[in-house]
Amino acid sequence: MDKRPNILWLCTDQQRWDTIHALGNSFIDTPNLDRLCRQGVAFTNTYCQNPICTPSRASFLTGRYPSSINANINGACNLPEHCTLITKRLADAGYYCGLVGKLHITSAWNDYEPRMDDGYSYFCYNLASGHHLNSPGNPYVEWLNQKGVDWHDIFTSDEKHDYHWY
């Protein structure tokens, strides 16, 4: 039996530690994140190396400062060839790595760039046209629709909803 730990690495852009109920925010409900905090590790004394999503992701996946790996703005990140992502190192060590969401660590500034050797065996990336939720084929909107929820109601209402996705 494999005794290596199972690693679930969640990245939520611009989310502070105090936006999770289990870590002290009594105003919101985050039951799934609360359960992860109870059963895993919650880092409550950490700092983000860059407030912009692409440089931040590139930094924590390479272990390097964004300025040292040409990851300074969104959409124009061209990592040097010598940079190896932690996911590639994990895959080389026998882990099965998967990505769901968006990564944005290869350049899309002028044209589509092929994926780097990132170590992901499963890669479910969808960036709906122009970051818009209502773009055709957006899996998140389709999932909401299957649940009988109109995303407009969630994002345009001042009401507190009883949706527990986080």
Feature annotation, model-predicted:
Residues 2-8:
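Extreme N-terminal starter segment of soluble prokaryotic enzymes
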Residues 64-166:
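Catalytic-site neighborhoods of secreted/periplasmic enzymes
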Residues 9-11, 17-100, 109, 118:
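Active-site segment of extracytoplasmic enzymes that catalyze sulfate/phosphate-ester chemistry
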